[in-house]
Amino acid sequence: MSVVPANIESESLAVGSAEHRRLLGQFFLDTFVDYVPEQMQWPELTDEELARLRGLPFWQEAVSTENVTSNTVAAAAALEADPLVRKAIELQGFEEMRHARLLVALTSHYRIAVESPPRFTPRSLESDFLFAGFGECFDSFFAFGLFALARQSGFFPPALVKVFEPVMQEEARHILFFVNWVKYRRSQLPWWRRPFFRLRCASIILKQVASRVKTARSMGKPQPAGGSGENFTLTAHQDLGAEVTLHRLLELCLRENERRMAEYDSRLKRPRLVPGIARLLYRVIPASV
C-alpha cells in the first residue's frame, strides 16, 4: 500500500487551463492506492493498548464525519461535465466511503461501541462539497500532526500506525485535489458569477474558522460525556495523553503537511490558508504554550 508519487515538475500552469485540468484529474487517478478495509490484517493488541484505543472518545464523531463527507463527495461528482475531473471526484467519494468502512472494520474488530449514523443526503451539491472540502483542509492538517504525535509517543503500536498510513496520505491527496478544484471551478464560471463564488467560499471558510475558534476556547474545560464533539482533530492531542504544547503541535502539523505534500507534482497549487494561519500562530505564541 505504498504511495506512488506523481511526476514532479517545476514549471507552473495557468489555473483553469487544459493542462491544469488534465493534471488535476490524472494525478488523483495515478496515485490511487488499492486496499480493502474488510480484508485488513488488524494487529493483536495488548490489554493496555486495547484499553487506550477503546478509551479514545472521538470514534463516534469520526464515524459520523466520514458518513457526511463520503456521501457529500460522491454526490458532488454530478457537478462536473468534464469526464476526467468527474472520474477523480467519483474516486475521492469511493475513498471517503472506504475510510468509513475502515472505521467500521476497526471498531468492530476491537469491539469499540459506535452507532451507525443515518445516511447523509446533501441538500446543495456545490455548497455542501465546499463546506466538506474546507472542513477537511482544517481537519487533515491537524490530523497529520496528531498522527505523527501518536507515532512518536508510542500511543499507537507500530503495526496499527502502518495500517493507517495510507489513510493519512489519502487525506493529503484529497485536500490537494480540493484546493485545485476550487480554483479550477472558479475559472470555469462566467466572469459575473466568480465574485459570488468567492463570497460563498469566504463565508464557508469563516464558518469553519469560527467553529474551530470556539473549540479552541473550550480546550481544557470539562467536555460532555460520550465524546469529544466536533473538530476532534483540534483537541485529540489531549485524548492521546501526550505532553505537548500547542507550539510543538503546530510545528509537527506544519512539518508533516510539507512532507506529505512534497509527494506530488509541484505544479499543483498547495493549500495555503490553514498552513498560513498555523505558521502565524507558531511565530507569535510562546514555545511554552
Where are these regions (language model features)?
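Non-heme di-metal
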Residues: 1-289
